[in-house]
């Protein structure tokens, strides 16, 4: 069974290993999370574990959600996510902490990437620019966006538009350190999104053989 937790990106720093090598790490406040609902195939049509993270004042929660949290006997949570693959011994009201992960373990981290705003094709899709002088009138334009015969622009054509703010998953990141007292995970490398962005950390699906 896979394991997972919801966390918040706090920022990046660096630590040193036993040989004095610098390791860039992202500090993530992972949990503590609480199980809100355990969904089973017989009743809900599929098996999943609904998990909540970060307390929120009761007056900020509408009545249906308030009743949902009360049934589980937990405080209202700001962020709620479902994990499809989960340990069967977890039940409603149980707490999930960083202790589910170990140092050296590989994880997949999912988050919302930083929004860049409206961007052209050079920045957004890495297009090459045209000549900048010698009479050229083609500098940073996208060029042709389709053929004459189709008389339309095909779906998926790379064009200028809003860049970033996409759901991104980075696979096979190493857990360098686990701090159980402060609920912190130190993950090697960078993870998607800005500081204070919400992340989902799961056990790696495609474990790299050379990692």
Curated annotation (Swiss-Prot):
<dbReference type="GO" id="GO:0006412">
    <property type="term" value="P:translation"/>
</dbReference>
<dbReference type="InterPro" id="IPR019926">
    <property type="entry name" value="Ribosomal_uL3_CS"/>
</dbReference>
<comment type="subunit">
    <text>Part of the 50S ribosomal subunit. Forms a cluster with proteins L14 and L19.</text>
</comment>
<keyword id="KW-0699">rRNA-binding</keyword>
<protein>
    <recommendedName>
        <fullName>Large ribosomal subunit protein uL3</fullName>
    </recommendedName>
</protein>
<keyword id="KW-0694">RNA-binding</keyword>
<dbReference type="GO" id="GO:0019843">
    <property type="term" value="F:rRNA binding"/>
</dbReference>
<keyword id="KW-0687">Ribonucleoprotein</keyword>
<comment type="similarity">
    <text>Belongs to the universal ribosomal protein uL3 family.</text>
</comment>
<comment type="function">
    <text>One of the primary rRNA binding proteins, it binds directly near the 3'-end of the 23S rRNA, where it nucleates assembly of the 50S subunit.</text>
</comment>
<dbReference type="InterPro" id="IPR009000">
    <property type="entry name" value="Transl_B-barrel_sf"/>
</dbReference>
<dbReference type="InterPro" id="IPR000597">
    <property type="entry name" value="Ribosomal_uL3"/>
</dbReference>
<dbReference type="GO" id="GO:0003735">
    <property type="term" value="F:structural constituent of ribosome"/>
</dbReference>
<keyword id="KW-0689">Ribosomal protein</keyword>
<dbReference type="Pfam" id="PF00297">
    <property type="entry name" value="Ribosomal_L3"/>
</dbReference>
<dbReference type="InterPro" id="IPR019927">
    <property type="entry name" value="Ribosomal_uL3_bac/org-type"/>
</dbReference>
<dbReference type="GO" id="GO:0022625">
    <property type="term" value="C:cytosolic large ribosomal subunit"/>
</dbReference>
């Amino acid at each position: 069974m896979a394991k997972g937790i919801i966390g918040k990106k706090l920022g990046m720093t660096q630590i040193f290993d036993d040989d004095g090598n610098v390791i860039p790490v992202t500090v993530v406040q992972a949990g503590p999370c609480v199980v809100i609902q355990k969904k089973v195939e017989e009743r809900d049509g599929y098996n999943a574990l609904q998990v909540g993270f970060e307390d929120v004042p009761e007056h900020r929660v509408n009545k249906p959600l308030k009743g949902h949290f009360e049934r589980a006997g937990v405080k209202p949570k700001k962020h709620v996510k479902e994990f499809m693959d989960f340990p069967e011994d977890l039940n409603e009201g149980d707490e999930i902490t960083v202790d589910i992960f170990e140092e050296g373990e590989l994880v997949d981290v999912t988050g919302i990437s930083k929004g860049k705003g409206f961007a052209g094709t050079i920045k957004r899709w890495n297009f090459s620019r045209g000549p900048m002088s010698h009479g050229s009138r083609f500098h940073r334009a996208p060029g042709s966006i389709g053929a004459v015969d189709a008389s339309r622009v095909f779906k998926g054509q790379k064009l200028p538009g809003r860049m970033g703010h996409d759901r991104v998953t980075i696979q096979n990141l190493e857990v360098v350190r686990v701090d159980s007292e402060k609920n912190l995970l130190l993950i090697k490398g960078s993870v998607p999104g800005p500081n204070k962005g919400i992340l989902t950390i799961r056990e790696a699906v495609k474990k790299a053989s050379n990692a």
